[in-house]
């Protein structure tokens, strides 16, 4: 670190929905000459993922504010105090010029200590319904950014930071116009798979005549790949040229861009990526998401004709088969174009710009 190099601390952890947008901003800031340090939980996915990206880490142990039983509630004051002390030590070691909170349990104690020690805090909320931590910290932060308009009062709508390759895909008009033959369907269950999709999609495809069936790439999750194969075989469909089963997809930009239609959950990052690429989507929100935020995430596109929303309780093989029969490449292309028009492909640059501006304003205030 040089004497003039500025430092960003990113606070994020727990799930990919918090960590991956944080990584996108971290890499952009590094490219602009910033030193970046990550604050996370040693038990979270960030503890293994972030160091692989060459970003040093500081750690805070904290399990969240929402109650998980009587013992957890009684222990909350002690755990919060300990996490605040760990956050204070980390901030003193790193001496950041600005702190970016991207969500996750540790953001609460670390965000409080950031403000109490006079350091500037920038918050980013990825979901359409803000979490408890960001609702509290939004009142204390210098700038509040949101991925979905209206998620927090008096916030700036930047969109969700995404990987560069997703924002650089060919426009949907050109992609869809260049295709012929069967529709291309991508089914994405996430890294853990989605049992409801794994069960319903094979049965729905079996109800279609062979010439009506799309070509399918079905990402199942490593633990579910054998069960999914059995589901397709039970439906009378063999896995081969028209159905490809994969446990994981490394290059999501290409997978989205090669599809005419995606059937998937509606986590914040998934919705942002689908809009950025511009691809038609049928969203089936995870019904047990906190505050049912996946439904409102999907509604952002669905209410403007840029996607279709089907609740899991309503999803059936018959419903899905009937809907697929009514789709054409032209109708899906129109949906994809509307989706692309609602994207915020420059979100990563915008969040980075805000962080730099806040750091600069804070430095000027000290002079």
Curated annotation (Swiss-Prot):
A Pfam family assignment: Glyco_transf_28
SUPFAM superfamilies on file: UDP-Glycosyltransferase/glycogen phosphorylase
Cellular compartments annotated: Cell inner membrane
Amino acids binding UDP-N-acetyl-alpha-D-glucosamine: 15-17, 127, 163, 191, 249, 294
CDD domains (UniProt xref): GT28_MurG
Metabolic or biological pathway: Cell wall biogenesis; peptidoglycan biosynthesis
One term under GO cellular component: plasma membrane
Topology of the protein relative to the lipid bilayer: Peripheral membrane protein
Reactions the enzyme catalyzes: di-trans,octa-cis-undecaprenyl diphospho-N-acetyl-alpha-D-muramoyl-L-alanyl-D-glutamyl-meso-2,6-diaminopimeloyl-D-alanyl-D-alanine + UDP-N-acetyl-alpha-D-glucosamine = di-trans,octa-cis-undecaprenyl diphospho-[N-acetyl-alpha-D-glucosaminyl-(1->4)]-N-acetyl-alpha-D-muramoyl-L-alanyl-D-glutamyl-meso-2,6-diaminopimeloyl-D-alanyl-D-alanine + UDP + H(+)
Domain of life: Bacteria
UniProtKB keywords: Cell cycle, Cell division, Cell inner membrane, Cell membrane, Cell shape, Cell wall biogenesis/degradation, Glycosyltransferase, Membrane, Peptidoglycan synthesis, Transferase
GO BP annotations, alphabetical order: carbohydrate metabolic process; cell division; cell wall organization; lipid glycosylation; peptidoglycan biosynthetic process; regulation of cell shape
EC assignment: 2.4.1.227
One Gene Ontology term of the molecular function aspect: UDP-N-acetyl-D-glucosamine:N-acetylmuramoyl-L-alanyl-D-glutamyl-meso-2,6-diaminopimelyl-D-alanyl-D-alanine-diphosphoundecaprenol 4-beta-N-acetylglucosaminlytransferase activity
Keyword NAD: no
EC category name: transferase
Purpose of the protein: Cell wall formation. Catalyzes the transfer of a GlcNAc subunit on undecaprenyl-pyrophosphoryl-MurNAc-pentapeptide (lipid intermediate I) to form undecaprenyl-pyrophosphoryl-MurNAc-(pentapeptide)GlcNAc (lipid intermediate II).
Family to which the UniProt record says this protein belongs: Belongs to the glycosyltransferase 28 family. MurG subfamily.
Protein name, per record: UDP-N-acetylglucosamine--N-acetylmuramyl-(pentapeptide) pyrophosphoryl-undecaprenol N-acetylglucosamine transferase
Native source organism of the sequence: Burkholderia pseudomallei (strain 668)
């Amino acid at each position: 670190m040089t004497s003039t190099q500025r430092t960003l601390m990113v606070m994020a952890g727990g799930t990919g929905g918090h960590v991956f947008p944080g990584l996108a901003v971290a890499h952009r800031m590094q490219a602009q000459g910033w030193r970046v340090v990550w604050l996370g939980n040693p038990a979270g996915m960030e503890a293994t993922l972030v160091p692989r990206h060459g970003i040093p880490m500081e750690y805070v142990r904290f399990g969240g504010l929402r109650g998980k039983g009587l013992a957890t509630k009684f222990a909350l004051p002690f755990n919060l105090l300990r996490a605040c002390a760990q956050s204070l030590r980390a901030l003193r070691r790193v001496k950041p010029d600005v702190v970016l909170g991207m969500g996750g349990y540790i953001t609460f104690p670390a965000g409080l200590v950031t403000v109490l020690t006079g350091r500037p805090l920038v918050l980013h909320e990825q979901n359409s319904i803000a979490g408890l931590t960001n609702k509290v910290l939004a009142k204390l932060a210098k700038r509040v950014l949101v991925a979905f308009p209206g998620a927090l009062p008096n916030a700036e709508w930047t969109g969700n930071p995404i990987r560069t390759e997703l924002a650089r895909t060919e426009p949907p008009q050109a992609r869809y116009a260049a295709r012929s033959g069967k529709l291309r369907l991508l089914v994405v269950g996430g890294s853990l798979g989605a049992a409801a999709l794994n069960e319903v999609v094979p049965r729905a495809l079996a109800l279609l005549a062979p010439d009506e069936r799309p070509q399918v790439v079905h990402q199942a999750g490593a633990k579910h790949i054998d069960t999914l194969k059995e589901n397709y075989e039970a439906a009378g469909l063999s896995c081969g040229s028209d159905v490809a089963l994969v446990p994981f997809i490394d290059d999501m930009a290409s997978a989205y861009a090669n599809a005419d239609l995606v059937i998937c959950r509606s986590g914040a990052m998934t919705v942002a990526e689908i809009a950025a690429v511009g691809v038609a989507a049928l969203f089936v929100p995870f019904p047990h998401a906190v505050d049912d935020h996946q439904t409102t995430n999907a509604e952002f596109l669905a209410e403007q004709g840029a996607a279709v929303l089907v609740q899991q309780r309503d999803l059936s093989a018959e419903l899905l088969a009937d809907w697929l029969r009514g789709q054409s490449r032209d109708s899906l292309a129109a949906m994809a174009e509307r989706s692309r028009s609602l994207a915020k492909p420059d979100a990563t640059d915008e969040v980075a710009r805000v962080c730099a501006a806040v750091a600069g304003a804070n430095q000027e205030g000290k002079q």
